């Protein structure tokens, strides 16, 4: 997810200390959990930290609290966002509509963003290639904003260290803007439609693209897109409906 990351302090505080072991440790933990859940093969091997990326052990002790806090803010933001989506689901259930509602939850539009570079109190510093060290930013943070409690608040546009982005891309290499690696381009999709999709707890391995969403919705609604609109010939839709995989986890992929 790109920045800036803003969240109420109490949400970030829920993750106090959770990331003090650094981004390599988080990437490894995520990788092992993905194995346990069946998302990746049991014999998969974790890639090492990408060349040129700063190792957690090389982050000065005086800066590690700052770097950890940026990830706590991000985690709090994610949980808060999920909670709001949950309210929509709860309302659908309360109205008796959830059973026959198709929900498509796409996690993001790309891989995790490394645009925060070395961790920043202002994402624009990194985006505009304005030279500044973490030490300089911490000095400004203390002098002008009152210290760490300002992180995640409305006066700053914080963005976490690229190491956290790399950890979030597990099990793949790369991050947002790196089109050559799956870590920059792949993102999970969760589907829910209780009336039509039998829950089997199995991950769907078929490869699909965001341009498959519209054909899926048309398919579900039994709609054939018009070939002509006001005398203008329409370009055929790219994409393939996902419905073939709804109740057959091992179905042959409809696209290659």
Where does each model-flagged region fall?
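Outer-membrane beta-barrel transmembrane strands
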Residues: 73-88
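Active-site His/acidic residue clusters
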Residues: 1-25, 29, 47-73, 107-126, ...
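Proline-centered turn/helix-capping motifs that create local helix->coil transitions or kinks
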Residues: 38-46, 180-181
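Histidine-centered active-site microenvironments of extracellular/periplasmic hydrolases
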Residues: 4-9, 93-193
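Alpha-helix capping and helix-loop boundary segments enriched in small/acidic/polar residues
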Residues: 18-25, 58-61, 65, 72-76, ...
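Structured segments of extracytoplasmic/periplasmic soluble domains
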Residues: 18, 32-41, 91-95, 216-224, ...
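Short coil/turn segments at secondary-structure boundaries
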Residues: 44-49, 255-256
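C-terminal cap/loop subdomain of S1 sulfatases and analogous C-terminal strand-loop tails that border
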Residues: 154-182, 196-206, 210-256
